[in-house]
């Protein structure tokens, strides 16, 4: 019964905070229900980061595609892997595609961006198994990879967006 904000988007928020910085502003737009559900099914978010960067994310759990997180990363054996990128982070000197970690460099619009060779560390463990193993290690006294304060910041952003979206009526046909 949960929405894709708390099930899926929360992980994108984690990645964005890690890669770009703290989120200081967010504006949400709710899409129309496709299944007739009361819960949020689809929407878009505009983010502002303390670094001055801005970003957008579209999300949906009613649009099967090759560009979802699990499909792209292959992390969940229950979801078909496509290994297609699902996130693109661009800046003034280049761009990075995720999860392929393809790096593009270019500062001049008159020149084509150059693909920069990178070597990403390959994890041989099934990520869900690695998460459970780490959880068990933490129970045994190991330091967690992510502390409670960091996780709380991501949760605060996700809950704020969920509340904003829940307060909106479905997007209808709007004349602009």
Where are these regions (language model features)?
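C-terminal helix-rich "cap/oligomerization" subdomain common to oxidoreductases
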Residues: 50, 99, 134-176
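NAD(P)-dinucleotide binding in Rossmann-like oxidoreductases
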Residues: 35-40, 51-130
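Predominantly a Rossmann-like dinucleotide-binding segment in NAD(P)-dependent oxidoreductases
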Residues: 1-47, 69
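A generic structural signal for residues located within well-ordered alpha-helices
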Residues: 8-11, 130, 149, 153
